[in-house]
Amino acid sequence: VEVDCSRFPNTTNEEGKDVLVCTEDLRPICGTDGVTHSECLLCAYNIEYGTNISKEHDGECREAVPMDCSRYPNTTSEEGKVMILCNKALNPVCGTDGVTYDNECVLCAHNLEQGTSVGKKHDGECRKELAAVSVDCSEYPKPACTLEYRPLCGSDNKTYGNKCNFCNAVVESNGTLTLSHFGKC
């Protein structure tokens, strides 16, 4: 669902760029990137980062969709390891780790084999938009950052309040820190 971004007031920031002023209606919506935003913050992200995220549904994004791995047949290997038997049907699901699995059974098998607890974020392939997200930090570091709150989640699983704070941390990490996704971790 497209969000009408023209209804939000805008101003010019210290870098001379148009930015939206998001202060009023902060009701949560779930973006097509799987991240919870408000409608205004979603528009602000799209403007600032050149993305084209739209609204999936009202309310916060569900972290994971429940799945029942016990419904898949399993066997015990010669080494005594339990293995889930999956068919080859291509019915992709997106894991909470951002990886697309061929089907729900394959995701269950991955968790059993690797000892992980990856959940199902949604049916269908993971959206490429999220993986291609990046932030231009070439103008950083800066000595001071504004207090505007537009959270970004770093690859260190830490939430940064805005692009400036994130980019300063990227510079400090010598480029090892990358953007995981927009929004809180």
Swiss-Prot record:
Glycans are attached at residue 174. Residues 1-63, 64-128, 131-185 form the Kazal-like domain. PROSITE patterns: KAZAL_1, KAZAL_2. SUPFAM superfamilies: Kazal-type serine protease inhibitors. Keywords: Disulfide bond, Glycoprotein, Protease inhibitor, Repeat, Secreted, Serine protease inhibitor. Disulfide bonds join 5-43, 22-40, 30-61, 69-108, 86-105, 94-126, 137-167, 145-164, 153-185. This is Ovomucoid. InterPro entries: Kazal_dom (IPR002350), Kazal_dom_sf (IPR036058), Prot_inh_Kazal-m (IPR001239). The record marks 88-89 as: Reactive bond 2 for trypsin. PANTHER family: OVOINHIBITOR-RELATED, SERINE PROTEASE INHIBITOR. The lineage of its organism: Eukaryota, Metazoa, Chordata, Craniata, Vertebrata. GO terms for molecular function: molecular function inhibitor activity; serine-type endopeptidase inhibitor activity. It is found in: Secreted. It comes from Meleagris gallopavo (Wild turkey). GO terms for cellular component: extracellular region. It comes from the Eukaryota.
